[in-house]
Amino acid sequence: DGLQFPDLYFFQPKKIFLLKGNTVEIQYLNMCDDEVESDFEEITQSQKLNVKSQKLPINIQQRISKENYLKKTEKMLAHIHRGDIYEANFCMEFFAEDANIEPVEIYEKLNEISASPFAVYFKKNQHYLLSASPERYLKKEDEKVISQPIKGTAKRNLNIELDEQSKMDLQNNPKERSENIMIVDLVRNDLSHTATKGSVEVEELCEIYTFKQVHQMISTIVSNVEHTTSPIEILRTTFPMGSMTGAPKISAMQIIEELEETKRGLYSGAVGYFTPTGNFDFNVVIRSILYNSENKYLS
């Protein structure tokens, strides 16, 4: 693990700047609420940070050769044919050593290319996450819990007719639909652990959402929970998200642990927040760059 990210990290922010459309909502803890005006003045008078990194070449390497990857894929298929699992999300790492990047600049470029609803720029000491994730893992709004797994991707096309055809092909692709529905069943089971009786429901099945670069097949599964149900318990009984493991979840995870070359770390994990009222919203960490600025390791 060249990144050396912590497995788990939470913090309580003293100061929050919450962007809502064209407005900014500022929330400070009582211990520092007397700093609001001075902070606001400093921000409004500051110049835009002009970050320009040196264009040094980065040598991206693959963690496993194509030949060995295909051999491991055959082993994965053997598990499927034997009935151990129905599907699995088999990942490999692409990485660079001695990489010098400017994280802010890279993040801005990444999200110019692929504007995503669950994008994240996160820094903890020397650790950076630059994410263009389109996927929600789990959200809680009062008594309602929402999961939106993604399975199924199709490239956009500049030609309107071809773009629409790409969308329709994805909608009707039996392989993509089958994979999506398997994960829907898994999520329904996960949510049932904390749901009130009979409340688990599929609101959207294999719907096509259009993003800047791709069309995605997304399903929406919801449940209701008692107001006394712990948010931690809801996360504990659903994590990790099925879209990044496969089904059945535990069997898929055991096989992934055996066949993948490196630990995933924060990749295929989640970033999100809790509110003081017990609500939360977490994404899926995919389509992301992870970077350790101390040892210059990029993944």
Language-model-derived ranges and their functions:
Residues 1-299:
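Extended alpha-helical targeting/anchoring segments
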